[in-house]
C-alpha cells in the first residue's frame, strides 16, 4: 500500500482527534468549564489516539506496522469510549457516586491506587451537568467523538481483511 493511501487514513484521524482536543481545551479556557477526573482521562485517551496517528504518519510502516498502529488507535478510541460511557452513565444516575470533590492538587498527593480509581471510575464532580449543546451533554459528545474515531481504524482493518481475502 502506498504512503498516500496510508496517510489517507491516519491524517484525517489525527486532524479529527486534534480538533476534539482543541475544542476540549477551548471549553476549559474560554468557556470556563472545569474538567472532572473522567474528563482528564478521556483527554488522555484522545491524546494517545492522536499520538498513535502521528507516529503512524511519521513512521510510514509496512503492512504489519499499519495493522499494529490501526489496532493501537482502535484500542485507545475504545478505551476513551468506555470512559465516556461510564461518564454518561454516572450523569444518568447521580446516586452512584458519593463523597466530596477534592482539588487536583490534593488528589495528586493521595496514593496511586486512589488516584487511578478516581480517574477511571469517576468522582462526585463527574455527575454534574454544566454544559450541553443540541441537547447532548459533554460526555455524550465525547462518547460520540470516540465512536466516530474508532470507526476510522475499524473500517480500515475490516477493509484490509477483505482485501487480503480477495487477493488469496
From Swiss-Prot:
Gene3D superfamilies: DsbB-like. Keywords: Cell inner membrane, Cell membrane, Chaperone, Disulfide bond, Electron transport, Membrane, Oxidoreductase, Redox-active center, Transmembrane, Transmembrane helix, Transport. GO terms for molecular function: electron transfer activity; protein-disulfide reductase activity. It is found in: Cell inner membrane. Its main location: membrane. Residues 27-44, 86-140 are periplasmic. It is a multi-pass membrane protein. GO terms for cellular component: plasma membrane. InterPro entries: DiS_bond_form_DsbB/BdbC, Disulphide_bond_form_DsbB, DsbB, DsbB-like_sf. Disulfide bonds join 36-39, 100-126. The chain crosses the membrane at residues 10-26, 45-61, 68-85, 141-159. Residues 1-9, 62-67, 160-168 are cytoplasmic. One of its GO terms (biological process) is protein folding. Required for disulfide bond formation in some periplasmic proteins. Acts by oxidizing the DsbA protein. HAMAP family: DsbB. Belongs to the DsbB family. This is Disulfide bond formation protein B 2.
